[in-house]
Amino acid sequence: MNRLRTAVTAGATAALLLTACGGPDEPAGGSTPTGSRGSAVTQERCRDNEAAGTITYVTGFQYQASASILDPIAARALGYFDDLCLDVEIQPGTGETAQNAQLVAAGTAQVSSIAGNGDVLVNVANGVDVRAVAMFGHVPVATLMTEPTTTDLKQLEGTTLGQKGALPVTIEAMLRTAGVDLAQVTQVVVGYDPTVLVRGQVQSLTGYKSNEPLTLAAKGEEVTQWNPEDYGVPGSMATTIVNPRFLTEHRGAVEDFLRAQLKAYAYCEEHADECVADAAELSQAGYDTDHNVQVWQTEDRLVRDSLPAGQVLGQIDEAAVRTEGDFLVRMGQIPAVPDLSTVVVPDLVPSLYDGDRLVWPVP
């Protein structure tokens, strides 16, 4: 989710890794492993992957069934990591993208999902050293919701807009492109209950395509979604970052982590209920499985519908990152686009495929 947050305390960073997690030897609930230790790699590759030690993976937000969160959870539950001789520990992230990036840069975690390329660029601009190795959605996940009576965004002038602490930069750009005078829109911070919109407390509400609209639809409420991409605003979702030193020393392990994740992604497309049950097992209490199945299916559609022709699932390309970086410069989010050769690893995911077929097992 494109939150573009940059501040986090050292205490919060340390506290994250004290939360409950799934350790490398504790498979989760809905899925049953079908392989065996090392069954998908050579003995030499198995030894190399084991030499990488435990890989700590931090989710983007708790155990939500989002792209780049549900698939690693399922990869572990299905035994795919074990098939590749990888020991993976899953930690729930808080949703603070800066926190995830700092954990990875420090080597406290080796891999993490992060909201999108924009969040990577903001963190790198703030001196956080990470590498982006994969990306799933080539579209912003943010949306702006209104009642159906709003037929033109300029109608929002003189009304109240609810946001979660900051107006997402993609939403701001959309409104400006539509000619909205933001000085004429009152912005208020609201919580995560989207019914504030249908109850008339706000006249527009920021959210995520895979979350608040689903909640409102389940309550029988009809809203209009205004999406940044319809106004030419670039964006992305579900980017995977890794620690640079770990990537240099254990590139094969990073490749195989992503290989298992991509295999699990395809599995979850056909077995959403089972994969969400794996996430629910990790969450343990208060997990809305029906809603999370919808989250996964919505994000999967966004990922598949936005996949550029000629690219494979998970591929991150430098040109798209540059386009997003140029946009962030124009919006005043970063001073300049960093040297992308030191940020993006565009060849890693394509190397896992033979044409459009994921290579499994590893030769």
Model-found features: residue ranges?
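Bacterial N-terminal signal peptides that target proteins for export
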Residues: M1-G11
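C-terminal motif of bacterial Sec signal peptides marking the signal peptidase cleavage site
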Residues: L17-A20
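Bacterial signal peptide processing site
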Residues: G22-D25
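Short, glycine-/small- and polar/acidic-enriched structural segments
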Residues: G29-V190, T195-R199, Q203-G207
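Small-molecule pocket liners
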Residues: H138-L144, S236-T240, P244-R245, G325
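Pocket-lining segment of extracytoplasmic ligand-binding domains
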Residues: Y192-D288
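Secondary-structure end/capping motifs
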Residues: H250-Q333
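Conserved C-terminal helix/tail region of periplasmic/extracytoplasmic solute-binding proteins
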Residues: V321-P363
